[in-house]
Curated annotation (Swiss-Prot):
Gene3D superfamilies: Alpha-1-antitrypsin, domain 1, Antithrombin, subunit I, domain 2, Serpins superfamily. Its main location: secreted. GO terms for cellular component: extracellular space. Belongs to the serpin family. The lineage of its organism: Eukaryota, Metazoa, Chordata, Craniata, Vertebrata. One of its GO terms (molecular function) is serine-type endopeptidase inhibitor activity. PANTHER family: SERINE PROTEASE INHIBITOR, SERPIN (PTHR11461), THYROXINE-BINDING GLOBULIN (PTHR11461:SF375). It is found in: Secreted. It comes from the Eukaryota. InterPro entries: Serpin_dom (IPR023796), Serpin_fam (IPR000215), Serpin_sf (IPR036186), Serpin_sf_1 (IPR042178), Serpin_sf_2 (IPR042185). Major thyroid hormone transport protein in serum. The gene is Serpina7. This is Thyroxine-binding globulin.
């Protein structure tokens, strides 16, 4: 059976020059999910979050041309929403507008309830799927956060809060990195390097996802060396997994791409989008929540001979400049307003650091063995069936079915570049 790991860490640094008493915090966790009553925002959130994901993707694609792209949209949305509820005036308005929300027709209370339910639903225990999202706030010992802020981040965001001595830079850096390494089960080590002085608060957001294909690949069918076209003049060799199976798929003649859905064993799916050669930018520009809904409606199940590269991908971004270009300017400026976090002035966002890691392949069960599955009854397979080879740049998405959340979004340009 196939095992996949998807890991994400987002770090925000807030800077200020303040003097106040230290505060000790305790841990709090949400243990049950309650569906908010009469909350229209809850039902709009999947579409709004998806549109934010594609807007951010397009920015990252422009800033990183011809490179692999990979990030966790839902985790970034959660972290920014958490930050917005501690902000005020234009700082809050800009953060929420970047996320796609308008406070004129969307009450803050509904947003809080919506994100609380999203986090709780994603973290709700599942039998064959490991999915855990979490947050941690590392607060300088000299900062006195408001009691309401501490209560909200625990209740709404299942957040751990740690009092931290940022005057001892190396010790603070070690404390944060150790936490991240533990929460990501050792997959992200030494996330923060060269931590600077005058950091007052750091928000860490992570997501861990591990699942098995509903129809696992056979290791013996993997081609150890197969061509993958990076561009017109560059071809690399990659292991190529191979399977003849029934998949939901669709050829979008309007967008000139082929869409294929691969289900995980429980409540999650992977969506691969293969544009025709020369049409990647066209597809990227058209990606939206409406596009996802269209594909979901038009996907048809049938036999497909599928070739998928076995690859690892990781990407690291400083989202500060990207978010500012998207309209979130005040949070990084001297005019930043965070009255919901502390009564002290001078608090502003210094950077937004994001890292995501993905491995996809047929490595096997948790013990590392990948059992062979029985042969297909060839009489069931029609003599004519489509062949889909993901042997050039393609888009990939990992979606959680219950909340319709885009957990991960990316583009594989070169599978040999991690």
């Amino acid at each position: 059976m196939s095992v996949f790991f998807y890991l994400f860490v987002l770090v925000f640094g807030l800077q200020a020059t303040i003097h106040c008493a230290p505060h000790n915090s305790s841990e709090g966790k949400v243990t049950t999910c309650h569906l908010p009553q009469q909350n229209a925002t809850l039902y709009k959130m999947p579409s709004i979050n998806a549109d934010f994901a594609f807007s951010l993707y397009r920015r990252l694609s422009v800033e990183n041309p011809d490179l692999n792209i990979f990030f966790s949209p839902v985790s970034i949305s959660v972290a920014l929403a958490m930050l917005s509820f501690g902000s005020g005036s234009s700082t809050q308005t800009q953060i929420l507008e970047v996320l796609g929300f308008n406070l004129t027709d969307t009450p803050v209370t509904e947003l809080q309830q919506g994100f609380q339910h999203l986090i709780c639903s994603l973290n709700f225990p599942k039998n064959e799927l490991e999915l855990q999202m979490g947050n941690a706030v590392f607060i300088g010992q000299q900062l006195k956060p408001l009691a309401k802020f501490l209560d909200d981040v625990k209740t709404l965001y299942e957040t751990e809060v740690f009092s931290t001595d940022f005057s001892n830079v190396s010790a603070a850096q070690h404390k944060i990195n150790s936490y991240v390494e533990k929460q990501t089960k050792g997959k992200i080590v030494g996330l923060i390097q060269g931590l600077k002085l005058n950091i007052i608060m750091i928000l860490v957001n992570y997501i861990h996802f591990r699942a098995q294909w509903a129809n696992p690949f056979r290791v013996s069918k993997t081609e150890e060396s197969s061509n993958f076209s990076v561009d017109k003049s560059t071809t690399v060799q990659v292991p190529m997994m191979h399977q003849l199976e029934q998949y939901y798929h669709y050829v979008d003649m309007e967008l000139n791409c082929t869409v294929l859905q691969m289900d995980y064993s429980e409540n999650a799916l992977a969506l691969f989008v293969l544009p025709k050669e020369g049409h990647m930018e066209w597809v990227e520009a058209a990606m939206s929540s409406k596009t996802l809904k269209k594909w979901n409606y038009l996907l048809q199940k049938g036999w497909v001979e599928l070739f998928v590269p076995k690859f690892s991908i990781s990407a690291t971004y400083d989202l500060g400049s990207t978010l500012q270009k998207m309209g979130m300017r005040d949070a990084f400026a001297e005019s930043a307003d965070f009255p919901g976090i502390t009564e002290d002035s001078g608090l502003k966002l210094s950077y937004a650091f994001h890292k995501a890691v993905l491995h996809i392949g047929e490595e096997g069960t948790k013990e590392g063995a990948s059992p062979e599955v029985g042969s297909l009854d060839q009489q069931e397979v029609p003599p004519l069936h489509p062949v889909i080879r993901l042997d050039r740049a393609f888009l990939l998405m990992i979606l959680e079915k219950r909340t319709r959340s885009v957990l991960f979004l990316g583009k594989l340009v070169n599978p040999t570049k991690q």
